[in-house]
Regions:
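A short, structural motif
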Residues: 1-74, 81-93, 102-113, 126-131, ...
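Amphipathic alpha-helical scaffolding segments
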Residues: 57, 77-78, 159-162
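Alpha-helical scaffold elements adjacent to nucleotide-binding pockets in ATP/GTP-utilizing enzyme cores
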Residues: 75, 94-97, 136, 157
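A short, terminal or domain-edge coil/loop segment
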Residues: 84-88, 122-127, 164-170, 207-210
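Extended amphipathic alpha-helical segments with heptad-repeat/coiled-coil character used for oligomerization
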Residues: 107-115, 125-199
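Cationic, amphipathic, low-complexity alpha-helical segments enriched
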Residues: 195-209
Length: 210
């Protein structure tokens, strides 16, 4: 129950219930599905009132992409919490980026929604946040999917790569080859490249979640 989980008072719970019903009707989603998405946001740590504001966006995205509502909610929370993409307008832009990237490539948004919570945490830990971080993740997954052949392998390869960044053994390996790893990374970033050192900064156009 959202009212209990989110510590809502009577009138607040009534207002939230009305918001969820309107979101369900306007997005062609069932009331239970919308409630599940908002409940997931609250369970992840978002305030109930704030989570309710995203009910319509969750519904529109689920309808447009056929992604699982629970996965979408976890994805949305990770975008907000890990990458610090805050507010409905910015989250809508982020979801549009993800949908557009999925449409262009082979890595569908349904699979992306399942993997993003882990990947956003890894990128955030490296100080890579915001819409640019999401663009890097999407591009990496799409290229990785084409190279590996499966969604799972693409995610695993990216996780392994991110986990190895800045490790002592990585830095030492570059030093043995006569390369200052940290300085090289800083130079690439200064020239407009991502911390992954392979992806130039690019911003895909918006998609059409609604």
């Amino acid at each position: 129950d959202i009212g209990i989980t989110g510590n809502l008072k009577g009138q607040e719970e009534i207002a939230l219930g009305e918001t969820l019903r309107k979101a369900a009707l306007s997005t062609n989603q069932g009331h239970e599905a919308i409630m599940q998405g908002v409940n997931t946001l609250v369970a992840q740590g978002m305030g109930a009132s704030e989570a309710g504001q995203y009910a319509s966006l969750l519904g529109k995205t689920a309808t447009a992409t056929n992604a699982d509502m629970n996965d979408l909610a976890k994805m949305m929370y990770s975008l907000s919490n890990s990458l610090e993409i805050k507010g409905e307008a910015n989250l809508k832009e982020a979801l549009n980026r993800a949908a557009y990237g999925a449409k262009l490539g082979q890595f569908e948004l349904k699979a992306m929604a399942q993997s993003l919570p882990t990947l956003t945490s890894l990128f955030a830990a490296k100080g890579i946040k915001g819409q640019e971080a999401l663009t890097q993740i999407i591009a990496s997954l799409e290229v990785g999917r084409g190279a590996s052949g499966t969604d799972g392998e693409a995610v695993t390869n990216l996780v392994n790569w991110m986990s190895s960044m800045n490790r002592d053994n990585t830095t030492k390996a570059y030093e043995k080859a006569g390369v200052d790893y940290q300085k090289s990374m800083q130079n690439l970033v200064a020239k407009g490249y991502s911390t992954r050192a392979t992806w130039p900064s690019r911003t895909p156009p918006a998609a059409s979640i609604g």
